[in-house]
């Protein structure tokens, strides 16, 4: 069906991503590749030279933790693990999804979403932001 699927995930909220796993697998069928993407918030404080080394160490720790959790998440899939790639980036989910989609020539984004609440209506959510700014089809799984 689809050759390249991007699945943004929050490794610190796995149950939200678990919903989307089966849909991503279905879309991947026999030869598609699923790219798991976890986005950590970017740090604007690197301009504070006095704290730059501490911030970098903290970001490296977060990245390492996210990579380990992504590796654990691969076991939730039933498809061949070699067809699941992992990406950890810093920035906004919306921008990083679009950037990775362009780099890979992705066909579709599959993203889990919780039922909307007052806070997501007021502040927006990652899923709604991805939908509004995506240059490719987005499947939202609830």
Curated annotation (Swiss-Prot):
Transmembrane segments: none annotated. Pfam families: Usp (PF00582). CDD domains: USP-like. PANTHER family: STRESS RESPONSE PROTEIN NHAX, UNIVERSAL STRESS PROTEIN UP12. InterPro entries: Rossmann-like_a/b/a_fold, Universal_stress_UspA, UspA. The gene is uspG. Gene3D superfamilies: HUPs. It comes from Escherichia coli O157:H7. Belongs to the universal stress protein A family. This is Universal stress protein G.
């Amino acid at each position: 069906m689809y050759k390249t699927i991007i699945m943004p995930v929050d490794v610190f909220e796995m149950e939200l991503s678990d919903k989307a796993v089966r849909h991503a697998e279905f879309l991947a069928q026999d030869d598609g590749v699923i790219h798991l993407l976890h986005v950590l918030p970017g740090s604007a404080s690197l301009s504070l030279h006095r704290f730059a080394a501490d911030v970098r160490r903290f970001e490296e720790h977060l990245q390492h933790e996210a990579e380990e959790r992504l590796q654990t998440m691969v076991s939730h899939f039933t498809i061949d693990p070699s067809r699941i790639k992992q990406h950890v980036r810093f920035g906004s989910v919306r921008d990083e999804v679009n950037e990775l989609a362009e780099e890979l020539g992705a066909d579709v984004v599959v993203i889990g979403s919780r039922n909307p609440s007052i806070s997501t209506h007021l502040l927006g959510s990652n899923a709604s932001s991805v939908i509004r700014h995506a240059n490719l089809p987005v499947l939202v799984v609830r």
